């Protein structure tokens, strides 16, 4: 049935094969990837899932800060691609991003001023009722985005 819709709308699909290597936090009060170390030695191509449940009283502050950070992520060194995922639109949000290596991802996450400021605001102003951060080793990728396999273009 899904294949019929994909064909009808001429949609592209891409599938990433992933191995969770490090992370922390909960998804609906569960450790959905099991017990993970908070750090690993893996430094290669990496995918990151950041997921949060935003407090209703903090929605305006959260969304006011999204566009500025998202636009800078796309131009960051080592950035390959990202996908926004809305489990419950506007409230339960996730970003799945792919990077050439862990260092490039960390440079964006912890060295880019705008992102650093947003991280500080989320903690200081208690934006989230729950959050989860998981990093994955990418073991494979099939399909296309805009006509190309996103990992083959950047290799």
Describe every region a protein language model picked out.
Residues 86-88, 118, 126:
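Acidic/histidine-enriched, beta-strand-rich ligand/metal-binding domains
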Residues 1, 7-94, 103-113, 131-155:
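Short S/T/G/P-rich N-terminal loop/turn motif that feeds into the first structured element of a domain
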């Amino acid at each position: 049935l899904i294949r019929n819709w994909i064909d009808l709308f001429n949609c592209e699909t891409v599938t990433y094969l992933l191995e969770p290597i490090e992370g922390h936090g909960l998804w609906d009060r569960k450790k959905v990837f099991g017990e993970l170390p908070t750090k690993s030695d893996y430094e290669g191509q990496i995918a990151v899932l950041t997921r949060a449940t935003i407090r209703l009283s903090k929605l305006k502050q959260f969304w006011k800060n999204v566009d500025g950070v998202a636009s800078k992520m796309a131009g960051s060194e080592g950035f390959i691609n990202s996908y926004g995922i809305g489990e419950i639109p506007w409230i339960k949000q996730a970003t799945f991003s792919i990077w050439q290596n862990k260092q490039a991802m960390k440079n964006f996450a912890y060295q880019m001023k705008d992102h650093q400021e947003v991280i500080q605001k989320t903690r200081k102003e208690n934006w989230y009722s729950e959050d989860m951060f998981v990093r994955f080793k990418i073991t494979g990728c099939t399909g296309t985005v805009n006509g190309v396999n996103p990992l083959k273009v950047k290799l």
